[in-house]
Structure formats: C-alpha cells, structure tokens
Amino acid sequence: MLFRSYLPFSVTFNVKDGIVEYPYGKLKIQIFTQKDLQNLNKVLLDNAVDCDKIGNVLSVRSRKEGDKFSSARRKNTKTLKKLFNEAKIPQPKRVCIPVVSSGEKTVWVEGFGTSSEFRVDKCTRRFIIITGLTGEN
C-alpha cells in the first residue's frame, strides 16, 4: 500500500472572523460574545475557545513531538501521539490534522475539540468557535 507523503506545516493568524487556510484544508473562525452562549448548540461549544485566555495571535500547525491535550470530556491529559493512536489515525495522516496553538500550548485539535484550559466558562466575555473545513487541495 502506498501512502502519500505529507509535510509538517505552521501558519500564524490573527484572531478574527474569517477563513484560515493551511496546506491541507481550512479553518473557519467565528467570534461570539457572552450573550450568544444560550443560542448555540452544545456540540459547537466543544470547539469554543475563550478569547481572554489566548491572546490575539494563534498558529495552526501540524503536531509536534510532546504536544499535550487536556480533554474536558475525559478529564485527562494525553500526548497527541497517544490520542491519535487511540483514535486509530494512520501515522502518515497525523501530520495533516490541524492543531491550533497559543505559544507552545495546544488550544484546539480537529476531531478532539478545545483543550480544557481554553474552554469557555462563566467568566467568558468573548469566544471563538473553530470549525475544520478540511479536504485535500
């Protein structure tokens, strides 16, 4: 079986409404305020990131060795390598999965949602929802 070769990537972007393109797809970024929380589907909140916890600049990139993710649903922290293994994602495809980071911290991973450290809470004033629009170009 032949696998396509995928290369690591990193794209920096400002936090604002719009589309962020990276080599293997796109991310849709939408900004909301506290009053929008009641009107959103609970599933979307798995991809909601508190703006006060991230700053104005983020990166979308491929995973790096040692990246960790704190799952709010599972209440634990694991390396992305372990998460991808458990999800049975083929190794060559793992580099394509977008990881949004703030500095060295993992904020959001497609298919896994927002890290517990960056999720919205009762003090949230503004937040973004990240939606993966992946697909090979």
Task: Give, region by region, the residue ranges found by the protein language model.
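AMP-forming adenylation/ATP pyrophosphatase catalytic core
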Residues: 1-137
